[in-house]
A protein has these predicted regions:
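Phosphate-group recognition and catalysis centered on beta-loop-alpha active-site segments
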Residues: 2, 28-354
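Bacterial N-terminal signal peptides
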Residues: 13-25
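N-terminal secretory signal peptides that target proteins for export/translocation
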Residues: 1-11
Length: 354
């Protein structure tokens, strides 16, 4: 009994030390490595999204992968825009020569009004300049408005190769096919130009640093039939794939749904809320890993409006919350990759404490 009382303080101090060491340890995915840092539309928290400036900044900040969303021009060229409607991310509305191009289209069942990449040749798009999408939240980015053109996918691949030569490290690319059924329906499918460019720049096998992602199912299955490049099935918290009426993303995240995804894809891309609920991890990461799928979550942003309540800081003068704390919490679920508008800060959040 006396020995037990004597040992209690030692045991207590040892437990505290172990807890401190665990908290200081780097966050690791189940693979034993830190989660990949995927620059969401480039370093889009600091530069207008989907510009060469945003991608280069992300690479310079140490991102493992950069993510270009891909749409097509009228002459079949892949360019980087989050949507094919470009009124909110370019100066097209200030070009009177294109005023008559404004139109209303039905895309994935939704009516959208604006200017669309498929109505412009690449040469015409070259006359436009990018603008900050989230100007109210990121006013500092607006100083870069009208400086950068819309890049082609090939220009992005050339940038990656140039930065690899400069830095001596491999830099991954993570393209998303945007609205593939819609584009195929108007005679502008993604698959052939996408695979041709990737092959031209040396991306041909599952060992190469590339993931192709989509919210749809059919184009991923078609890609799997002709390529071994790694594929990611994107999912959302609501709705379902535009090309699979009657199927919901919730259905796809059941054990059976994950098994079906594993037949054609190498991983899933859910929103962060699907892996980390307010009460704790949801178990989705474990279920996905059990069927051999990687998990790459989107999107970590610094602003309070994008963070769960527990990680918000309402009094912050820049409107930013506890981004580092949230990044660590998400990484702690065992995810294999994390999309972020702020790749440098995401990387720093996962570094071990000194």
């Amino acid at each position: 009994m006396i020995l037990g009382r004597m040992l209690r303080p030692v045991i207590h101090r040892t437990a505290i030390l172990l807890l401190t060491l665990l908290m200081a340890a780097p966050v690791m995915a189940e693979t034993g490595a830190e989660p990949l840092i995927i620059a969401h539309r480039g370093a889009s928290g600091e530069r207008p999204e989907h510009t060469l400036a945003a991608y280069e900044r992300a690479i310079d900040q140490g991102a493992d992968y950069i993510e270009p969303d891909l749409v097509l021009t009228r002459d079949g060229v892949l360019v980087a825009r989050h949507e094919n409607e470009i009124g909110g991310t370019t100066d097209v509305a200030d070009h009177p020569e294109f005023a008559a191009r404004k139109a209303t289209r039905t895309i994935d069942g939704q009516q959208v009004t604006g200017w669309f990449t498929e109505d412009f040749t690449l040469a015409e798009l070259r006359t436009l300049r990018a603008r900050e999408r989230l100007a109210a939240l990121r006013p500092a980015n607006s100083r870069f408005n009208d400086l950068y053109p819309i890049p082609t996918f090939e220009e992005i691949l050339k940038l990656v190769r140039a930065k690899e030569a400069e830095t001596g490290r491999r830099i991954g690319v993570y393209p998303e096919t945007k609205h593939p059924s819609y584009f195929a329906g108007i005679g502008l499918p993604h698959q052939a130009p996408l695979l041709a460019l990737l092959s031209q720049y040396g991306y041909q096998t599952e060992a190469d640093p590339v993931f192709i992602q989509s919210f749809e199912v059919g184009n991923l299955k078609a890609l799997r039939a002709v390529t071994r490049l790694r594929l990611i099935q994107l999912v959302d918290g609501e709705g379902g794939p535009a090309d699979a009426p009657g199927t919901t993303y919730a259905d796809m995240m059941t054990t059976r749904g994950l098994e079906q995804i594993a037949d054609y894809a190498d991983g899933i891309g859910p929103p962060t809320a699907m892996v980390l609920a307010p009460e704790g991890p949801t178990g989705l990461v474990d279920r996905a890993h059990q069927v051999g799928l990687q998990v790459h979550v989107w999107t970590l942003r610094m602003e309070n409006s994008f963070l769960p309540t527990a990680f918000q800081r309402p009094d912050d003068p820049q409107g930013r919350g506890d981004f580092a704390g949230y990044a660590r919490a998400v990484a702690g679920t065992g995810v294999d990759g994390m999309f972020s508008d702020f790749p440098r800060q995401a990387r720093e959040a996962l570094k071990p404490a000194l």
